[in-house]
Curated annotation (Swiss-Prot):
It comes from Brucella canis (strain ATCC 23365 / NCTC 10854 / RM-666). GO terms for molecular function: glucuronate isomerase activity. SUPFAM superfamilies: Metallo-dependent hydrolases. The keyword Isomerase applies. Belongs to the metallo-dependent hydrolases superfamily. Uronate isomerase family. The gene is uxaC. This is Uronate isomerase. GO terms for biological process: D-galacturonate catabolic process; D-glucuronate catabolic process. It catalyses: D-glucuronate = D-fructuronate; aldehydo-D-galacturonate = keto-D-tagaturonate. Keywords: Isomerase.
Length: 466
């Protein structure tokens, strides 16, 4: 299973040799992780990870969704249910189930990330199987007890320069404060994710808004609600935040008058908002967040187009983030126009657009980002954060948006040990793509070196103000 040094490079010898040279120039660059979902408590408390299953299987919905698709219950993977039904607590049994079904992950990015971690973090080069499951479990478990496997030591070992968590608007950020107070050199910063207090279609929307204004000490009015967001954004900024993140069902924006927006707020805060009112409120809030970003400088990320909790049975029994979120078709040209009419020409605003609809890359997103000063294209996201997905992204966007209307790479993960693996993959695919341009005489090699460095490091650092 030993990692091939030419993985993800072209099979054509000349192009492969160019890719090798390019990759050698960026392989050791620091990791900028400007958007992700690791837990701040890991860095604050710096405690050992409990066991291999808790590290690799239970928190990784890429893993659990594949196993669930093959008929393995989430309970058998140690996922706790809301209704109190028993779930597997024996980490070794969970690991054995994972190992027995490792063949399911052939040709998936999950396999690339896992095997990279096995070799580079644990020194294990055997391919996981039913036969060696216990031996590999024991080897990992033994290392997890060692000081060099604690979160802070891994941060240094992975050569991470900065990492952003994703945090609710009302989060007190106590673990970020603990990291700062500890004097540790690691840069762990929050990102402002206000979805729970913005999505009027959620059953808990009203209570989340009440919580927001309560924490901020503002009245439960439209203006008080906006002031609460401003208050919390400043709270996040004081702890190092440089970005906000917005995971909406669509990319719809609106630019209502102050009176219409206030009346809309009064309707939705009473609960039981109509579908159209909920969508209009989300749309208005994207524009309001853009307005706030111009004032406070937070980079704005929009992650639209996921049909969340598509499987109601799984959602009712297990809750959010259990692998049942599905990409859906997403429009940008018409839906973003109200926001762009208001702020799209303002260079003080940076809006990073992501999509789960690859058909929008060349038709909508690249032309939009290739024109509006306020827009940038986020990297291939979620289902397309893969070798083929990243390559499709480059091919579909570069001819219209170029490289410099993109923002480098986001690992966007909950799986801590996959962070260096994901950046390794992205750097290799980008170098392979650039090598092809050099081999086709569309780019000089000295230019390719510069672009490779920018894609691996500089663009993320610059765009996210890190």
């Amino acid at each position: 299973m030993a990692l091939n040094p030419d993985r993800l490079f072209s099979a054509e010898p000349g192009t492969r040799e160019i890719a090798r040279r390019l990759f050698a120039s960026v392989e050791k660059l620091p990791i900028i992780s400007p958007h992700g979902h690791t837990e701040p408590i890991w860095y604050a408390r710096n405690e050992a990870f409990p066991d291999p299953a808790s590290l690799f299987v239970k928190p990784d919905h890429y893993i659990t969704r594949m196993l669930y698709s093959q008929g393995h219950s989430l309970e058998s993977l140690g996922i706790a249910s809301r209704d109190g039904r028993p779930s597997e607590t024996d980490a070794r049994k969970i690991w054995r189930l994972f190992a027995t079904n490792w063949y399911l992950f052939r040709a998936t990015p999950s396999r690339l990330w896992f095997e990279h971690a096995m070799e580079t973090v644990f020194g294990i080069t055997e391919r996981l199987s039913q036969e060696n499951a216990d031996r590999i479990f024991d080897a990992i478990a033994d290392q997890l007890t060692q000081p060099h496997m604690r979160p802070r030591a891994l941060y240094d070992r992975f050569n991470i320069e900065a990492i952003s968590t994703t945090d609710a608007a009302t989060d007190p950020l106590i673990y970020h404060d603990e990291v700062i107070a500890s004097g540790w050199h690691g840069r762990i910063i929050p990102a402002y994710r206000p979805d729970a207090a913005v999505d009027a279609g959620r059953p808990d929307f009203a209570s989340e808004v009440e919580k927001l204004v309560g924490v901020a000490g503002t009245p439960l009015t439209w203006q008080g609600y906006l002031d609460a967001h401003r208050n919390r954004r400043e709270y996040f900024k004081r702890r190092g935040a440089t970005s906000s993140d917005h995971g909406h069902p669509t990319a719809q924006t609106a630019d209502l008058s102050a009176g219409d927006a206030s009346r809309l707020f009064d309707r939705v805060i009473k609960g039981n908002a109509s579908t159209s009112d909920a969508e209009m409120f989300r749309a208005q809030m994207l524009t309001e967040m853009a307005r706030m970003s111009i004032d406070d400088g937070l980079v704005m990320q929009i992650h639209p187009g996921s049909f969340r909790n598509h499987n109601p049975t799984v959602f009712e029994r297990f809750g959010l983030d259990k692998g049942a979120d599905i990409p859906r078709q997403t429009g940008f040209v018409d839906q973003l126009k109200p926001l762009l009419d208001a702020f799209g020409n303002d260079p003080r605003l940076t809006v990073i657009l992501f999509t789960l609809d690859e058909t929008a890359y060349s038709r909508e997103l690249a032309p939009l980002a290739g024109h509006y000063p306020a827009l940038k294209l986020g990297p291939a996201w979620w289902f397309f954060d893969s070798p083929e997905g990243i390559l499709r992204y480059r091919k579909l966007t570069t001819e219209t948006a170029g490289f410099y209307n993109t923002v480098g790479f986001n690992d966007d993960t909950r799986a801590y040990l996959s962070i260096p693996a994901r950046h390794d993959m992205a750097r290799r695919v980008d170098c392979a793509y650039l090598a092809g341009l050099v081999a086709d005489h569309r780019l000089e090699e000295d230019e390719a070196y510069e672009v490779a460095h920018d894609l691996a490091y500089r663009l993320a650092k610059q765009t996210y103000k890190l």
